[in-house]
């Protein structure tokens, strides 16, 4: 197993909560990556989506999934870095995810993301990007 860190964007975490076509491949991929991180923003996104789309059981399952993900606080440095990203079409929340991932430095092996714009921005920033299917 790898000691390196993998960053999970909200789009990846959601696929662990809801049964989607990519869920089995993602779950298998993550077996090799026990060190999983996401922004605290991701927790908010995931729980809001769980409440909007699911019920109390889904929200409880989302909380269980999130216990396996270390959350990185979106501090002033990360927010400033997100605001300074060059990609003009990158949405605000996605820029925070990307800035958080970039803040991890050389310990970051890559980012798991299913959102096309964020995936392209992460690649442009030089990150390894995965979207297991």
Task: Give the label of every model feature segment.
Residues 1-5, 38-39, 102-133:
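Acidic, PIN/NYN-like endoribonuclease modules and their adjacent C-terminal/linker elements
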Residues 8, 38, 73, 92-95, ...:
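Short beta-strand scaffold positions
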Residues 32-33, 68-69, 107, 125:
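Structured helix-beta-strand junction loops
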Residues 12-13, 42, 78, 97, ...:
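Alpha-helix capping/helix-boundary segments
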Residues 1-38, 51-61, 126-127, 133:
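Short, well-structured N-terminal submotif of metal-dependent ribonuclease cores
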Residues 11, 47, 63-66, 83, ...:
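Amphipathic alpha-helical segments within well-ordered protein domains
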Residues 67-88, 94-100:
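Acidic catalytic patch
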Residues 23, 43, 59-62, 79, ...:
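A general structural signal for well-ordered alpha-helical segments in protein cores
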């Amino acid at each position: 197993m790898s000691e390196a860190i993998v960053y999970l964007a909200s789009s990846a975490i959601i696929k662990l909560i809801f049964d989607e076509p990519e869920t089995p491949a993602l779950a298998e991929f993550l077996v090799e990556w026990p060190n999983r991180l996401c922004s605290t923003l991701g927790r908010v996104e995931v729980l809001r989506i769980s409440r909007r789309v699911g019920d109390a059981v889904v929200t409880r399952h989302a909380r269980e999934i999130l216990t396996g993900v270390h959350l990185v606080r979106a501090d002033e440095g990360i927010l400033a870095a997100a605001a300074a990203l060059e990609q003009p079409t990158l949405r605000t929340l996605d820029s925070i995810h990307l800035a958080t991932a970039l803040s991890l430095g050389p310990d970051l092996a890559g980012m798991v993301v299913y959102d096309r714009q964020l995936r392209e921005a992460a690649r442009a920033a030089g990150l390894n990007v995965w979207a297991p299917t």
